[in-house]
Amino acid sequence: MTLGERMLHYRARNRISQSKLAELMDEDLMTIYRIENGIHKPHKINEIRLTEKMDKLEAEERGKDTND
């Protein structure tokens, strides 16, 4: 699954906007939009950084699921 697909699936599961995801990841809204839509593929170092942020959000999401 690509980073953009992960972002899209995360947003769908959590019913949040691209704007909210950008806020949670401390990223620019246009960055989220471009990656999700396959318009932009970040440089490797940025992709790693963004992937780490997605990993953290998904881990927090899993933690909420087990605490509910």
Residue ranges and their predicted role:
Residues 1-2:
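A detector for short, charged/polar N-terminal pre-domain segments
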Residues 5-20, 49, 64:
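Short basic helix-loop element that most often maps to the first helix and adjoining turn
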Residues 12, 26, 37-39:
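Residue-level detection of the helix-turn-helix DNA-binding "recognition helix"
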Residues 16-33:
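Short alpha-helical DNA-recognition segment
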Residues 25, 35-36, 46, 54:
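DNA major-groove recognition helix of helix-turn-helix
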Residues 43-63:
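DNA major-groove recognition helix of helix-turn-helix/homeodomain DNA-binding modules
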Residues 66-68:
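Helix-turn-helix/homeodomain-like alpha-helical modules used for DNA recognition
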